[in-house]
Amino acid sequence: MLMVQLNPFIIEGYLSPEYFCDRVEETALLTRHLTNRCNVALIAPRRLGKSGLIYNCFQQENIREQYHCIYIDIYDTKNLNEFVYALGKGILTALKPKGRKVWEFFLNMLQSLKSTISFDINGNPEWSVGWGDIQAPDITLDEIFAYLEQADKPCLVAIDEFQTVANYPEKTVEATLRKRIQNCHNANFVFSGSKRHMMALMFTSQSRPFYHSSSIMGLEAINEQTYLDFANHHLARNNKEISAAAFTYLYHHFDGITWYIQYVLNMLYTSISDRSLLQEDDVRMTIDSILSQQRFAYQALLYQLTAKQKQLLIAIAQEGKPSSLMSQEFLQKYHLGASTVQGAVKILLDRDFITQDEGVYQLCDKFLELSLRAG
C-alpha cells in the first residue's frame, strides 16, 4: 500500500509537538499557570499561533492525562445562545473519545437539551442541537457549569476569540460568565483573543467584570533563526533547504506571522523546483502562485464593498500600516474625502477587512493586502 507523505508544514489545526515550531517558553508558562489553577488571558494578533499554543499545552503529558481539555472558537457567534451552543458542542467533542461513562455523565446534566441529543448507529452521541433548541440559555449554561464543577477530572476550557462576547446584544454576558467561572472550582480557563485593545479593556479595566481575573500572556513572532532551523529540519525530508536570505525575505514579508509563513513553506515543500537550495525567487514565485489561486475568491470578497470602501481598502493596503486615515497627506495621496473615509472605515472594521491595533490600521489578510498592492 502506497504511503502518502505528510507535509510537515501544518496550516490548519494541530498535529503533534513534532510539527509545532518552538514556543517552548510560552508552552511552559501557560502549562504552569493552568496547573497552578490560574485563568489566563492570551492576547495576540490573529494567525500568530494562539490556538496552536493552546493545543500544544493540552498535549503536555501532565495536562493530557490529568485534565479534560476543551477548546472552542466563538469568532462566528452572535449572541449568548450561540455561545452556549458552541460550549456544549465543544465539551461533547472533547469527551466522546474518553468513553461512554464520561460523555454520558455530561449529557445527563443537560436536562434542558436531553430530548435534542441524537445517537449514531454505534450508539455514540451527536450534537444535533440547533440554536433554536436552546430556549433558555441561562439554564443550559448553568447545567454546563454544573458539569464542569462535578466532572471526574478537572477541566481546562479554552475560549478562542473571547472578545466576541463584548459585542453580543445581551449586555450582561461578561458578568454572567464571570460569576459562573468564579464559582466553578473544578475548571480553569484560557481566554484567547486577537483584538488586543478590546481584550486589554476586558481584563484591565476596573469597570469590567473580568478585571484582574486572569494572568495576562502575550505572544510575539517566533524567533527568525529558530523558525529557519525548524523549516530546514523538515525540508530536509524532501531533500530541500531554504537559504537564510530567502527565509529572511519570507519572514519579514509577513511580519513573522506564523500562518502565512507556514502556508508558503507548505507550498515550497512540494514545489517542482529542481533546486535543492531554495532561493528568494522560489519564495517570490510561490507567493505569486498563492495569490493567483486566491484571485477569484478575493474578487468575490471585494464585490461586497462599495467603490469608496474598496478605494479605502486599497489605499490602506498600498500604505502598509497608516497611523491616521484622516491626515491631509493620506487623503490627498489617495484622492479620498474625509466623509468617505469616516463612513467606509467603520464598515471595513466591522466586516474584519481591516484591524486597528497599536495605533495603526492594516488589512487582516496579508495575502489580500499583497494582491491589492499588485493591482
Give the residues covered by each predicted segment.
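C-terminal leucine-rich, beta-strand-based interaction scaffolds used for sensing/assembly
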Residues: 2, 6-7, 292, 296-375
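A short, basic N-terminal segment
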Residues: 1-40, 45, 355, 375
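C-terminal helical "lid" of AAA+/P-loop NTPase domains
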Residues: 247-253, 259-273, 311-314, 346
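Helix-loop-helix "sensor" segment of P-loop NTPases
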Residues: 201-252, 274-276
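Conserved C-terminal helix/linker of AAA+ ATPases
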Residues: 271-293
